[in-house]
Amino acid sequence: MQYLFIFLGGAVGALLRYLLSFINTSFEMPIGTFIANLCGAFLMGFLGTLAIQYFNNSPMLKKGITTGFIGSLTTFSTFQFELVQFFESGSFILLIVYALTSYIFGILLCFLGVRLGAKIS
């Protein structure tokens, strides 16, 4: 049954990730991937913290949200591939800006998610 929750959460996260990828064509920097990863970082902190409090008796739902939905929404491999593309095209400034903003804001948003989740629970 746990696999079903992961599958359903994954389907929703993957669809949202796919829809966000359309934003990538409008900017020099892959904004869709950036948004997906930052939202995922915040949600992992927020929902991960809430899951400890509210979903502790439902590990299937917790896995569906974290592993399924957030896992398929975020995309570390696409992020790495985009960094390599910047490198190969000689766009070193974009590479550095994209990497640093993704990591720094990702950590900050995850931290904020944890703090907000702790306040609510």
Curated annotation (Swiss-Prot):
Keyword terms of this UniProt record: Cell membrane, Ion channel, Ion transport, Membrane, Metal-binding, Sodium, Transmembrane, Transmembrane helix, Transport
Record comment: activity regulation: Na(+) is not transported, but it plays an essential structural role and its presence is essential for fluoride channel function.
Example of a GO biological process term: cellular detoxification of fluoride
Subcellular location: Cell membrane
Catalysed reactions, as listed in the record: fluoride(in) = fluoride(out)
Residue ranges of the TM segments: 3-23, 31-51, 64-84, 92-112
Pfam families (alphabetical): CRCB (PF02537)
InterPro entries: FluC (IPR003691)
UniProt keyword Isomerase present: no
Keyword Cytoplasm on entry: no
A single GO molecular function term of this UniProt record: fluoride channel activity
Annotated Gene Ontology cellular component terms: plasma membrane
Membrane topology: Multi-pass membrane protein
Residues annotated as binding Na(+): G71, T74
Homology family: Belongs to the fluoride channel Fluc/FEX (TC 1.A.43) family.
Protein function: Fluoride-specific ion channel. Important for reducing fluoride concentration in the cell, thus reducing its toxicity.
Protein name as it appears in the record: Fluoride-specific ion channel FluC 2
The species this protein was found in: Staphylococcus saprophyticus subsp. saprophyticus (strain ATCC 15305 / DSM 20229 / NCIMB 8711 / NCTC 7292 / S-41)
